């Protein structure tokens, strides 16, 4: 049986000191450093390694978690299919499961009560953590998205920088 390559060790989940000014309960996504921080009390955060969108494709600024799903289905957007025609084969959707690009869980980013189409989600390609390869979503290993999912209520503020 072949196993997927694991992400680089520096992207493993860690409890770290956090120097930012965001209040506990906030999620901060640092796209340049490839880390997501779940801010906790007392100057601490849980830090996760992430994969980010290709240059210019990741949402920036504030959003909130407007929906959560376990083993979500995935359908590529029309824009994704235009950029990557091979995705046409998935235009009717891919059911949730281990071969789904959204992985084990997804946190849906909303602005003004509307779905932005950007997600924090797991991945079936864990070796891409630390890279800028997605169509704009923020990906974590399946183990990490499950951990983040469990500690993140609806309405959580997400700041993407």
Residue map of PLM features:
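Cell wall/extracellular polymer interaction/catalysis modules
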Residues: 1-83, 96-98
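Exported/periplasmic cell-wall-interacting domains
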Residues: 22, 42, 47, 54-62, ...
């Amino acid at each position: 049986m072949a196993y997927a390559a694991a992400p680089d060790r520096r992207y493993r989940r860690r409890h770290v000191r956090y120097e930012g000014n965001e209040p506990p309960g906030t999620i901060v996504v640092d796209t340049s450093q490839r880390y997501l921080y779940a801010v906790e009390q007392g100057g601490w955060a849980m830090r996760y390694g992430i994969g980010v969108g290709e240059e210019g494709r990741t949402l920036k600024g504030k959003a909130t978690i407007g929906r959560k799903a376990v083993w979500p289905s995935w359908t590529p957007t029309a824009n994704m299919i235009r950029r990557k025609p091979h995705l046409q084969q998935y235009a009717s959707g891919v059911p949730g499961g281990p071969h789904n690009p959204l992985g084990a869980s997804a946190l849906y980013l909303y602005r003004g009560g509307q779905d932005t189409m950007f997600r924090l989600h797991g991945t079936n390609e864990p070796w891409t953590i630390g890279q800028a390869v997605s169509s704009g979503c923020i990906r974590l290993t399946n183990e990490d998205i499950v951990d983040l999912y469990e500690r993140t209520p609806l309405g959580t503020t997400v700041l993407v920088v």
